[in-house]
Amino acid sequence: MIQPQSYLNVADNSGARKIMCIRILGGSNKKYGHIGDTIIGVVKEAIPNMTLKKSEVVRAVIVRTCKELKRKNGTILRFDENAAVIINQEGNPRGTRIFGPVARELREANFTKIVSLAPEVL
């Protein structure tokens, strides 16, 4: 459950380390973002000499949340951190590698490129 002002770790090699959510996209007044939702965020911590710099506004898709996700078959999926992957306007990841597991719900949200780059899909 991500809301504005929430901090997320970045799960790719785009150059950002942490981003802060400033808006959840999809709907006029959407309050919370879940796995597979697109957000607008600002880079709060970045690696030096990389493409993304601090205070840059970016789009990202949420790939892991601490809030549990209930599936139709009754299983509950919960992660240890809130994490996102930075994407461009077309929805493709800006980095070339994804770190850590991602949820299967990203495939249903049409982020197949992120799912194919991920080392593990839960």
From Swiss-Prot:
SUPFAM superfamilies: Ribosomal protein L14 (SSF50193). One of its GO terms (biological process) is translation. The keyword Chloroplast applies. GO terms for cellular component: chloroplast; cytosolic large ribosomal subunit. Gene3D superfamilies: Ribosomal protein L14 (2.40.150.20). Binds to 23S rRNA. Part of the 50S ribosomal subunit. Belongs to the universal ribosomal protein uL14 family. This is Large ribosomal subunit protein uL14c. It comes from Chaetosphaeridium globosum (Charophycean green alga). The gene is rpl14.
